[in-house]
Amino acid sequence: MARLVVVALLVLLSLSGLEAIQHAPKIQVYSRHPAENGKPNFLNCYVSGFHPSDIEVDLLKNGKKIEKVEHSDLSFSKDWSFYLLYYTEFTPNDKDEYACRVSHVTFPAPKTVKWDRNM
């Protein structure tokens, strides 16, 4: 019984230690297909390598939050960092600007990364 208690305490201590580690997310904004004006496409925001898991991600059109956005389930890598994919349908043109805004404990303020149609 004592051995079980010791093992349980070690597991709890190791898990609580993971919460102390913080890694800033890497943010990548890209379209599923090469951008063509007037042709429907998908805008993707891939956020990876972050810890802890609490994160807020918004896709933006001309600085305003896009409401109809879907996302993958929160997943983790071998190093226990997390990753997510947020995406929405959009139709590129020359007048609209698209971006991904991410809020995470490792950022002093939300970070916004613009979509570059040439990437």
Curated annotation (Swiss-Prot):
Keywords: Disulfide bond, Immunity, Immunoglobulin domain, MHC I, Secreted, Signal. PANTHER family: BETA-2-MICROGLOBULIN, MHC CLASS II-RELATED. CDD domains: IgC1_beta2m. Component of the class I major histocompatibility complex (MHC). Involved in the presentation of peptide antigens to the immune system. It comes from Cacajao melanocephalus (Black-headed uakari). Residues 25-114 form the Ig-like C1-type domain. It comes from the Eukaryota. The keyword Signal applies. Gene3D superfamilies: Immunoglobulins. Transmembrane segments: none annotated. This is Beta-2-microglobulin. Belongs to the beta-2-microglobulin family. GO terms for cellular component: extracellular region; MHC class I protein complex. Residues 1-20 form the signal peptide.
